[in-house]
């Protein structure tokens, strides 16, 4: 991990990210099922759901340590890409956003049928 990431308070996933654990994850699921899984995951992490936009596939949630946004993009009817943006509130940032995203993906990998990482870069 690059030095600049150790002091960053915000992290975002993408297909082309240079950190392997922050690359987009793809799942074999319908959009409604993926949205439901992300909402349930957020509730399990004791987050408050701020907004759910099913048309755009965006879910915004937060708790006392971070704000997060999940974007669910349909690459086909039964394949979804899920990306996260996490902004943390820690006084001494030591890449906590990266750890939060890794926890999110580990839960979703068990909940949804995992297809792959960064499939369409």
PLM regions and their residue ranges:
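Ser/Thr-rich, low-complexity intrinsically disordered terminal regions
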Residues: 1-121
